Amino acid sequence: MLTVSLLTLSLAAYASAVATVTDANNFMDAVLHTRIPALITSEPILFPFATIPPFNFTVAGTNILTNRELQVNVSRGEIRGFSTEVKRVGDCMPPVLREGKTSIRCTLNFTGINATFDTHTRGDNIVASDKNIWVRASVIDTTGQFEAVAERGKQGNVHTFLVDKIHVKVKNDKALSLNDKRKKKFRQHFEDKVLTVLPQIFYGAYLHLLGAAVSSVPFPHV
């Protein structure tokens, strides 16, 4: 009877020491929602926003009677949401032991990160009016893969951080009068700019902060 009781206690102690899905979820949430927001305030590349340098482009006119070549001057772009919009999708995978290290894998969602642009245009109509308008580009339907690993008794580190194909939706001020063809080309320039800059940020400054955040949160081991 004593042997059975000791065995039961041993199994209970073992079970309580094994990390669960809940532990993995709590770890990921602490990294994303507690540590990243705290660390990001000391990262000038990301706080209070990431900056997109000025750029210019033109959109050809389509009808000499109604519009001219559209000249676009973007004086500033600001990307926000790195501290608030990155979230896990559902549950993380149960922590497992891989090559002597505990591994935590989660799918992340980047929807909601957005860029706003200070934009000056000329030529959307036949009189070539000068207009100061807003443009907003939002990340939609974009996920990524994350894995952190740690040896027992040591800090965790980022093993995998991969952002899947980034999707962006662009909207602009209704004060800008463009037909569908010109509107598509106009918005494409902003989409292309965001798709160029975001990966540089994700795999640069953000990944650096992610690593610091992971190493500062107690790691749940199996």
Swiss-Prot record:
Glycans are attached at N56, N73, N109, N114. Disulfide bonds: none annotated. Induction: Up-regulated following blood feeding. Keywords: Blood coagulation cascade inhibiting toxin, Glycoprotein, Hemostasis impairing toxin, Secreted, Signal, Toxin. It is found in: Secreted. Residues 1-17 form the signal peptide. The keyword Signal applies. Salivary gland (at protein level). Adult midgut. GO terms for molecular function: toxin activity. One of its GO terms (cellular component) is extracellular region. Inhibits host coagulation by delaying thrombin generation and reducing endogenous thrombin potential (ETP). This is Salivary anticoagulant protein P23. It comes from Ixodes scapularis (Black-legged tick). The lineage of its organism: Eukaryota, Metazoa, Ecdysozoa, Arthropoda, Chelicerata.
